[in-house]
């Protein structure tokens, strides 16, 4: 799960737990703006990501990277104030996949079996 998905999960849990007749929490919002980059990447993207009163801003070469980095900053702020308790973030490079291998020709992770050779 990435940072954007984590914040969407937090929002969905808030929506599901809100009482009928009350205002639902505002969903995470984001906006992009092109900014001047450098010689290697002439145009970069600035993303402003807002959720639960916190805002994260990031400038990266792609929109996806900018959105993830901005969402990460919001997650860090929420974590500081204990608002992410009960939620877990597992990234592909975390220790959860320590013994798994990734085959670039496939779009999924697979676990090494006993018949596979050890690398």
Swiss-Prot record:
Stored CDD domains? DSRM_SF (cd00048)
| GO MF annotation: an example | RNA binding
Where is the DRBM domain positioned along the sequence? Answer: 3-79
Query: By its UniProt entry, which SUPFAM superfamilies does this protein fall under?
Result: dsRNA-binding domain-like
Q: Quote the function comment for this protein.
A: Induces host cell G0/G1 arrest and apoptosis.
Query: GO CC terms on record?
Result: host cell mitochondrion; host cell nucleolus
Which UniProt keywords are present, listed alphabetically?
A: Apoptosis, G0/G1 host cell cycle checkpoint dysregulation by virus, Host mitochondrion, Host nucleus, Host-virus interaction, Modulation of host cell apoptosis by virus, Modulation of host cell cycle by virus, RNA-binding
Enumerate the subcellular locations listed in this protein's record, separating them with semicolons: Host nucleus, Host nucleolus; Host mitochondrion
Q: Cite a single GO BP annotation.
A: symbiont-mediated perturbation of host apoptosis
Protein name, UniProt field: Non-structural protein 3b
The taxonomic lineage of its organism, from the top, reads: Viruses, Riboviria, Orthornavirae, Pisuviricota, Pisoniviricetes
């Amino acid at each position: 799960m990435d940072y954007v998905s984590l914040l969407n999960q937090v929002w969905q849990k808030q929506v599901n737990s809100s009482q009928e007749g009350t205002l639902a929490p505002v969903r995470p919002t984001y906006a992009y703006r092109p900014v001047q980059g450098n010689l290697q990447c002439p145009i970069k993207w600035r993303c402003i990501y807002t959720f639960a009163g916190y805002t994260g801003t990031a400038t990266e070469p792609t929109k996806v990277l900018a959105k993830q980095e901005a969402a990460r900053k919001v997650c860090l702020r929420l974590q500081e104030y204990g608002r992410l308790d009960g939620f877990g973030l597992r990234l592909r490079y975390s220790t959860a996949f320590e013994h798994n291998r990734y085959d670039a020709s496939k779009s999924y992770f697979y676990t090494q079996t006993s018949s596979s050779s050890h690398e």
